[in-house]
């Protein structure tokens, strides 16, 4: 996690902990998170609590700060799909839909790899596929996540605002 980010959770696992007066703390084993919160912060702009999905895992192999993470967490909101692209409004009976902003953390606890994804729970697979075809790069996914977390709306790419009258 980054400075200011926090993980709180409960779970279970088979752990071995070693500590002596002349040695550093050592931890071994896997801890499966059953319920928890990842407090995500980005500079002074975003502070959101993502719900950690059951089955997320922290694996310890000695130094607790070198633990490996495989954490999947979501932040739920409602957003208007037509902000992303007007054609998506044709695919759904309603344009305000539930959206899961998905935070994926893997790698070492000290320097995790962070990536994002989006889900449309309750929507059909075709609608989600179309949404993801519009968000086809990591940069665009990150931009969409930031807009959703800050403004509760999708980022509208510049090309969607153009029409044939703009050209001379």
Task: Locate the predicted segments by residue.
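Strand-loop-strand
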Residues: 1-157
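Charged, low-complexity interaction regions
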Residues: 159-161
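Short, intrinsically disordered, charge-balanced linker/junction segments flanking boundaries
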Residues: 163-168
């Amino acid at each position: 996690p980054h400075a200011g980010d926090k993980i709180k959770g409960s779970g279970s696992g088979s752990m071995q902990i070693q500590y002596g007066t002349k040695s550093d703390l050592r931890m071994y084993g896997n801890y499966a998170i059953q319920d928890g919160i990842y407090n995500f912060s980005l500079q002074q702009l975003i502070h959101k609590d993502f719900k950690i999905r059951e089955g997320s895992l922290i694996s310890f192999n000695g130094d607790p700060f070198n633990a490996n993470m495989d954490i999947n967490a979501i932040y739920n909101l409602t957003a208007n799909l037509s902000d992303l692209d007007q054609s998506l409004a044709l695919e759904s009976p309603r344009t305000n839909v539930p959206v899961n902003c998905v935070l994926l953390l893997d790698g070492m606890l000290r320097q995790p790899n962070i990536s994002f994804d989006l889900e449309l729970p309750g929507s059909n697979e075709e609608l989600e596929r179309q949404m993801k075809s519009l968000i086809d790069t990591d940069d665009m996914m990150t931009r969409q996540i930031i807009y959703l977390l800050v403004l509760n709306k999708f980022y509208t790419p510049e090309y969607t605002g153009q029409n044939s009258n703009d050209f001379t």
